[in-house]
Amino acid sequence: MNARESIFVDVVAVETLTPLIKRFTLALPDGAPLPPFSGGAHVLVSMQNGEQWHHNAYSLLSSPHDTRQYQIAVRREEASRGGSAFMHEHVAAGTRLAIGSPANLFELARNARRHVFIAGGIGITPFLAQLAEHAPGGDVELELHYAYRSPEHGAFVDELKAGPHAANVHTYVESLGQRLDLMRLFKTLPADAHVYVCGPQGLNDAVYANAALLGWPKSQLHSEQFAATDTAGRAFTVVLARSGIELEVPEDTTILQAIERAGVKIDSLCREGVCGTCEVAILEGEADHRDQYLDDDEKAAQKTILLCVSRARTPRLVIDL
């Protein structure tokens, strides 16, 4: 996120929703409206912890019809690289944060009427704004299936069951023996429905596997993953050919983080290997691809790399930057 794109916001409220999830309400210091967004959008939040910066993408879960405030929810991850832990431990009402403009990589498919949401855990967040954006009885039909570990981990359940879409909200609590039967769900859907999944990798994989067994078109499946990609590995050297800069990438640091700490500006959005914004060409060396953006053939070709999650297999990697 370049400085010119930063929006400085104040945290006006922090709520503990579950043992692991907090909701943060953000507003401009002067109370002016924030930039418009659509359901499924996220913002990149930048946090300064001493000399170290953390950059995390979070879905906007508030209504797109009211931009006086943004709301995000942050789950504290056990394997946090620092961002979620910082938000939980150091961010309170009155804290000022820098965010990027909203970007949407998870929009509803245009010209489709029936949209079915499948959420696991914190993966519920992008669907909250989708539901708030579209009133029941409108041009689109929305249906939510939300699975979570136990009653105390069911963030937003009370709001969903009291909301305008309550009749089409279905919850599944693992500790109570309730299971989301994906095969049965797919068999009940009309052929033109679009299905959206957001949650752990296992849930995403299960949705796609069940859809494939029934011959469901991939063009009608949409996913966003809410699980931290393992970006750690052995240290290596990255060379920015056009910039004439050589950097050491430590074991616990991504290439993108190393480049940013060196003061080099580079565009990025999701920082989870999904959107492709930070893709650059490989000039020398071999990448250890860990993204969800490149397909298997593209990864095997070793032509490009996503700097936010992937690493180097070789001791030295030269990129076109």
Kindly give the residue locations of the regions a language model identified.
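C-terminal accessory/binding modules appended to enzymatic or scaffolding proteins
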Residues: F236-D267
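Short, surface-exposed secondary-structure boundary micro-motifs
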Residues: Q48, P102-A103, L283
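FNR/FR-type flavoprotein reductase catalytic core
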Residues: A85-A241, E248
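Ferredoxin-reductase
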Residues: N2-R96, R113, Y148-P151, E159-K161
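A short, compositionally biased
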Residues: G39-A41, D230-T237, V274-G276
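Iron-sulfur (Fe-S) cluster-binding segments and ferredoxin-like electron-carrier domains
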Residues: E260-A262, D267, G276-L321
